[in-house]
């Protein structure tokens, strides 16, 4: 069996204690709204492309979001979504 046939486990360090993902996303969301953008579209654009131009400098949102890895943001979003929509 080749290594391409095996499921790989994805791990990354949990340094999010320094930078709170929820706080960052809320600040970025508010900054985008204040500037008249659709926050969801802009955040998705950033997450897919990695291009910080989707996030304004307003309220230091661009610098804040760049302190976090995109995979960390996606992990937190998926985790939050599943926790809220999980059928128990």
Swiss-Prot record:
Pfam families: IreB (PF06135). It comes from the Bacteria. InterPro entries: IreB. Belongs to the UPF0297 family. HAMAP family: UPF0297. This is UPF0297 protein RBAM_024500. It comes from Bacillus velezensis (strain DSM 23117 / BGSC 10A6 / LMG 26770 / FZB42) (Bacillus amyloliquefaciens subsp. plantarum).
């Amino acid at each position: 069996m080749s290594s391409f046939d095996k499921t790989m486990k994805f791990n990354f360090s949990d340094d999010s204690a320094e930078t709170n993902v929820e706080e960052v996303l809320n600040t970025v969301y508010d900054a985008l709204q204040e500037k008249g953008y659709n926050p969801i579209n802009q955040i998705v654009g950033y997450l897919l492309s990695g291009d910080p131009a989707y996030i304004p400098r307003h309220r230091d949102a661009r610098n804040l979001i760049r302190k976090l890895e995109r995979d960390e943001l996606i992990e937190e979003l998926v985790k939050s979504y599943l926790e809220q929509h999980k059928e128990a």
